[in-house]
Amino acid sequence: ASGGTFDNAQLMNRNQTTDKPLLVIMELAANDVCFGQGTQPEDFRKNIYRILDWLDTVLPPGSHLVSIGLVNGSIIHEIMGTKTHPMGMPFNDFYDYLNCVGVDLCENYLTSNVTKIQETAAKAMALNKVYEEIFSNYTAKNYDFVHYDFPAEWIIEKWASQGGDPFDLISHVDGFHPSQ
């Protein structure tokens, strides 16, 4: 989630005077909406500003940041839900099992509860609006930046137009992460 991303970013140790410029990619995917009520927009805003401000204190001048928004994870349910998991059950049942035993990777998207999935997607899109607000007003001294929406739909459409099955883009083991 965005709060933990700040902790991870602090592991980056750079010398602003002697190091060459960096290309930093920041992608939160769905972590801010995966569990419980998710990160509230105002907390998300504070977390992202905190990350951006901190990066400006460590990135060498001339660095670049590419930010990618949160994914609309409802697409996972659409692609995977009724397909069969390698354990022999539909992915929806597999997701519910993981929720039941408390080891789900993203309980708000990986579920058979369509209402919960739709609510989670709406929360993710609301956080993407916060991203848009931040990046339309933010200025950094040591790096420039660009922000993109998470291109899941485009990737899936492109894959399908080339004859691929969208099911093959997602790991068949966890039913969530991109397949390798």
What are these language model-derived features?
Residues L22-E27, D32-C34, S63-G69, V146-F150, ...:
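Structural recognition of the beta-strand scaffold that forms the well-ordered cores
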Residues A1-D53:
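Conserved SGNH/GDSL esterase-like catalytic core that processes O-acyl groups on lipids
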Residues D19, L70, H77:
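A substrate-binding/cap region within the structured catalytic cores of diverse enzymes
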Residues A29, Y49, D53-P61, E132, ...:
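Sec-exported extracytoplasmic/periplasmic mature domains
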Residues D32, G73-I76:
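Surface-exposed, flexible loop/turn segments at secondary-structure boundaries
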Residues I75-Q180:
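Catalytic His-Asp segment of secreted/periplasmic serine-dependent ester chemistry enzymes
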Residues N15-K20, V58-P60, A140-N142, D149:
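Extracellular/periplasmic catalytic domains that process cell-envelope and extracellular macromolecules
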Residues S2-T5, V66, E78-H85:
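Short charge-dense sequence patches
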